[in-house]
Amino acid sequence: MVQCTVTSDGPIRDCLEWIANNYACANPVTAMAERSALTSRTFARRFLAATSHRPIDYVQALRVERARALIESSGGRVDDVGFSVGYEDPTFFRRLFKRTTGLTPAAYRRKFAPIAGAHPPSVAVDGPQRVGLQ
């Protein structure tokens, strides 16, 4: 899971805030490096120092985290979920998702998506309670 990283490195902090909302863009690492006004190499070194992750690993973890949430909460096609988080190649998305979570996207949905018609544990399914009526 991607942790919210706090850093005093201004350009990296700005990039982390930007990528949180723009993770699906094409070439996000290049976009962050350009945004930071640092060379690609300097950006990568400073990003690693600030987050303990390589930029591409951070972006992929963020994308998979968002994909997990979408798979759990929507009935949309897995390929569409992959596209929505920034992957143009469905095969690559499925492989990366499985490598990250240990499950294929379809298996993840079967395991973690709520069952249709199920009630949350806090909802009474026996009908309304008659409190105070005699």
Summary of predicted features, one role per range:
Residues 4-28, 47-51, 68-77, 97, ...:
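Basic, amphipathic alpha-helical hairpins
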Residues 14, 38, 42:
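Donor-nucleotide binding loops and adjacent catalytic segments primarily
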Residues 26-30, 38, 48-89, 110-134:
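Terminal helix-turn-helix DNA-binding modules in bacterial transcription factors
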Residues 41, 90-91, 106:
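Key DNA-contact positions within bacterial/archaeal DNA-binding proteins
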Residues 43, 67, 93:
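Short hydrophobic/aromatic patches on the structural cores and recognition surfaces of FHA
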Residues 94-95, 107-112:
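Generic C-terminus detector
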